[in-house]
């Protein structure tokens, strides 16, 4: 379910403040955040934000297409190791 329109999009205040400071000073550095639920705003375009995935911070470069989505959508929380290959045991059961 999406957030109510009357409430507006959520963003962590500290994160928005740091982005606005960096835009004002013309800086480009990686910002660490644990706020996966923050919405990507147009002010963030061109910045790299390291989003926490539960173990480490994964750098995400923000582009125009990401505006309106949540930061957590761009970082996987589970390691996909692929499916098992066919083993002798599985082929024997047939």
Curated annotation (Swiss-Prot):
Pfam families: Ribosomal_S19
Superkingdom classification of source: Bacteria
Keyword field: Ribonucleoprotein, Ribosomal protein, RNA-binding, rRNA-binding
Annotated InterPro entries: Ribosomal_uS19, Ribosomal_uS19_bac-type, Ribosomal_uS19_CS, Ribosomal_uS19_SF
GO MF, any single term: rRNA binding
Cellular component, GO annotation: cytoplasm; small ribosomal subunit
Chain segments annotated as transmembrane: none
GO biological process, one term: translation
Keyword rRNA-binding belongs to the record: yes
Function: Protein S19 forms a complex with S13 that binds strongly to the 16S ribosomal RNA.
Similarity field: Belongs to the universal ribosomal protein uS19 family.
The protein's name: Small ribosomal subunit protein uS19
Natural source organism: Clostridium botulinum (strain Hall / ATCC 3502 / NCTC 13319 / Type A)
């Amino acid at each position: 379910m999406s957030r109510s329109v009357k409430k507006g999009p959520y963003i962590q205040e500290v994160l928005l403040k740091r982005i606005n400071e960096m835009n004002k000073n013309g800086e480009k550095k990686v910002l660490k955040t644990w706020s996966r639920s923050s919405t990507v705003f147009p002010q963030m375009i061109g910045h790299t934000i390291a989003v926490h995935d539960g173990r480490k911070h994964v750098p995400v470069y923000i582009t125009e297409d990401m505006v309106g989505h949540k930061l957590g959508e761009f970082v996987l929380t589970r390691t996909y190791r692929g499916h098992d290959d066919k083993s002798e045991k599985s082929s024997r059961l047939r």
